[in-house]
């Protein structure tokens, strides 16, 4: 089977994203392929993460609320249908990417499963209710453990091509 992996992280703070890098790399290593990320544009990740070899592409999405919630779901459905991902990993509790992935027919939708999100996931492995009290990094650690994905390093690393500076 050809893996085409997408990882969704909806928080807009760059620091929170940086702390997710070890988990993103672990998922890439687990599937032995580069991954695509869907992130908020406010992170400026396309500039900051461009030299990481395990990241193939970064797509920006707004992850808005209210009326725009459904516009963003439709945008995600279009992305998922175009890219034909085999797996979508959601590294937080949001429903939007899980709903879009389910509508798009993605077979492997994996996330922490807090609240209503578990209705849209294709796995029956969810974080425990008390894991809600963990920080984002610890929640991602637990999610990877649940799915037998080996974490090689707890600390983030950003590669920078100094010739391009």
Model-inferred region functions:
Residues 1-165:
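Catalytic machinery of carbohydrate-active enzymes
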């Amino acid at each position: 089977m050809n893996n085409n992996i997408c990882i969704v992280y909806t928080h807009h703070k760059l620091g929170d994203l940086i702390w997710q890098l070890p988990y993103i790399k672990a998922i890439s290593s687990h599937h032995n392929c580069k991954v695509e990320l869907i992130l908020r544009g406010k992170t400026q990740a396309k500039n900051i993460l461009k030299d990481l070899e395990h990241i193939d592409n970064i797509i920006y999405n707004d992850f808005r609320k209210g009326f725009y919630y459904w516009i963003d779901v439709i945008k995600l459905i279009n992305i998922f249908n175009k890219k034909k991902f085999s797996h979508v990993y959601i590294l937080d509790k949001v429903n939007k990417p899980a709903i879009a992935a389910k509508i798009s027919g993605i077979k492997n939708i994996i996330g922490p499963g807090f609240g209503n999100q578990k209705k849209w996931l294709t796995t029956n492995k969810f974080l425990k209710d008390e894991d809600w009290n963990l920080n984002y990094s610890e929640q991602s650690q637990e999610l990877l453990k649940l799915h037998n994905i080996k974490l090689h390093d707890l600390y983030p690393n950003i590669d920078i091509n100094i010739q391009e500076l």
